[in-house]
């Protein structure tokens, strides 16, 4: 574990603890995730970022997309928080006055649905509760899960502005919602209309598009809807007998026989010659005696679907309704708000429409009206909150007119930056096609719409409360609409309301908003729509989108698949037993719990080991290498663990030499070698700093993490460590000089990586490996103006890289004589890099081989000697190695090459097979990645063979 030592210097600066009275953290201890977290908990209060250059500098506002209070945070939330916090720290380290505001969303339909499911498990159903009783239960849920989410948010170590936390139904946000609605209503932009909506019968409410899940049904399947087995994937052919004819009939194709009682016409295409003679005649309704319905023709009919004859059920199909309006067809509703049949026959009235399906099919069979039933693929629209089948239903709703609003957004969108840039085309296209927004919901949880009906006049007015409504109605009786607002209405105002609107009108745009691609149009676009109207400018200057997080096989993360990973389980670790226990405590049906448990056993047989917050954050960044997808599994964090642990262990390694300062002078070779290493590593660090800065500015987050990784693992852990091993062991004076250079580099590097891995970087910056002279009151981002970052020495980089490559190449030799101190074997080196000679003694010590320089002419002479093998290090340097030192290397390389070629042939055979197109997308993706990996390995081996050719 760490040891903490307090120095009791009385020096202070601006009321902040200065370096001399901070906690020193000793770095001798082995890498320990929990211990690092303990250290961070102690020193975090001493992390301060530079103050703005001007007292009047504007705030740099950042808005967290608020998590729903439906349950725990998931990986998508964690990714957004990690990206936003890294950017927040990046800008804070540059002196910006960052205010990163966290909050939670009341999530109307989502929360009410999850609470109702929770109550049902206890045997309590919504129809048994009053409105106040249900709202009381939801409020209790809100308090519990809001507290849980806030604790989770704190565990991500983000620099949240906790003094300004928000909730979408707190007083300030509620006032903002009322202000916005009333203003839009009075401007004539909010109106009431009777139109088709996505209706969830179980919720008895309209739902937004994001709450509609489209399921592809490719073959007949039985699905359970509200515990009722229902068959989907069938096309039913039903005969309608022509009036006045005993042997003529028209056959209709439908996937929904349960709506047949609402049929008021049948339609054909005007281009279908088969049915032209029937247009204008009447047919008998198959199940309603004495009801004749007309045969009409309409261009909306697809003559290639089924029989080419369409049954027209106006009140339960948008297409049918439009056809009915054009032909003055009667409209009859056969379904109530709960999805139960009405205005049908006594056999099915009152039945749930899906339960009634099989009974109606039997009635058709009894009347010899069912011609056939054949398998048929279709898209099934399901409510993601309840699992019920969505119905197109015409009901009065409140709408926001968007024509003028979207035009204003599009006018300003040329100033808006979108990342990735491909999203711009979708952004513009969506706004152009956008229809009026249905903003009302028929549930109890949410912002009750501040609109009141004047009962005597059947007129609506908008007011924030009853008293104001009475005033506007001049004392006439008023009644508030019971509907609540769509959740997205309140969250769309957050760029304003989270920062003080409407009390404060001077709200500056967010520099950026970062979120998942899946809510670009449900949330981000609607923020633009509303906030542009109220502030006269777009609410953000940039939109940064990340893809949907999927598992390692490319599948969407789903509880039913058992592939959902709780971010806290990765950070803190979890046993398989506790993962299963969490499933039981959730809202999944027992059948899904068993299925998920089996998936968990397969994916996490040993549970998940604790990774800590830094490894988790860095691992998420490494997952961002593709703009279109994020494939996540526990292997995603192995590189992150290697990075963080290597950083700690590297500091431990050099820390042992910090007290070895010695007045003895360095030899010329040592001085030149260490100087070259210093200049080369500083130069590499210069590239890394510039690369990371550019990556953050261009929102290439994977690149930033990758540059950090390459510098640490290649330039420091490999090149610097290997080329200084001789010096740290040779003398105290050279060991201290190597440590001093490393310490200076580490100090800059820790600040460079701080935005992504704040804990370990903060802890190490407060350790004694960083000299006191290097620390300051504020943690700023490295700049090229710093002394060591002014270095840009390409020559030193080339020399050092050649020295390292020579060392590694010679270490690969397998001669047992390598271990002999006598150095009986000589390797000849020809190079145009004169300073390379300063590394010869260090390389000789590490390899037990004698290095001897030769000219280009001597190289040609030795090449004629068949006892040497040419090894090309670079265009500047070649080695001539005794052949006896390569007894088996080329043989092994060729065997590996053959094995890889066989694997490649097998994959290519699979991917070129005729049936491969039907393979799941995750299989195709996996094979594609595997093929790329094999090709890279093949190329590496071919290069290795080339380097060792005679």
Curated annotation (Swiss-Prot):
This is Valine--tRNA ligase, mitochondrial. Belongs to the class-I aminoacyl-tRNA synthetase family. A motif ('HIGH' region) lies at residues 67-77. Residues 1-90 form a transit peptide. The lineage of its organism: Eukaryota, Fungi, Dikarya, Ascomycota, Taphrinomycotina. SUPFAM superfamilies: Anticodon-binding domain of a subclass of class I aminoacyl-tRNA synthetases (SSF47323), Nucleotidylyl transferase (SSF52374), ValRS/IleRS/LeuRS editing domain (SSF50677). A motif ('KMSKS' region) lies at residues 556-560. Its EC number is 6.1.1.9. It is found in: Mitochondrion. It catalyses: tRNA(Val) + L-valine + ATP = L-valyl-tRNA(Val) + AMP + diphosphate. GO terms for cellular component: cytosol; mitochondrial matrix; mitochondrion. Pfam families: Anticodon_1 (PF08264), tRNA-synt_1 (PF00133). InterPro entries: aa-tRNA-synth_I_CS (IPR001412), aa-tRNA-synth_Ia (IPR002300), Anticodon_Ia_Val (IPR033705), M/V/L/I-tRNA-synth_anticd-bd (IPR013155), Rossmann-like_a/b/a_fold (IPR014729), tRNAsynth_Ia_anticodon-bd (IPR009080), Val/Leu/Ile-tRNA-synth_edit (IPR009008), Valyl-tRNA_ligase (IPR002303).
